[in-house]
Amino acid sequence: MERLWAPWREKFILCERKPGCFFCRTAKENQDRKNLILFRGKKCFVILNRYPYNNGHLMVAPFRHVGKLEELKEEELTELWKISQLCVKILKSGLKPQGINLGMNLGKVSGAGVADHIHLHIVPRWQGDTNFMPILAETKIVSVGLSNTYRLLKKELQRIDKRHSKRRSADR
């Protein structure tokens, strides 16, 4: 049996967790730059993953605490996908990936790190972005720091979609 191994995620798995839901707490803090919240819509928000599978790994989550896809309200589901489309545009123009994975892990057994608050992963991909480093050195190479990626994607968001950049400031 083959196993998928992501040793760089160990930091996330072993980190001390604050009580309550990460997504709810982070959205309420209103410290978007510090928390890497790239964008806030009416029903959903976009956040950079602190433990990325690749540079530019984004997550889109509803503000409302909901753990099941079938429990999302129609307006949440619609906005989640519209914002995801915008994220793909800014990733393509800002980071120039050769492909993009979109996916949800529904439930703990499917691999969800935060199983009780639904979120969509958007992961840019490049030819050869998987290599021997995670296996031999237990290290995942992410070539650009989170703060630089945040600034770059924020700039792309403002360039591509003026409507979104004028909504509630993300630099609180």
Set out the residue ranges of the language-model regions.
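HIT superfamily nucleotide-processing domains
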Residues: 1-172
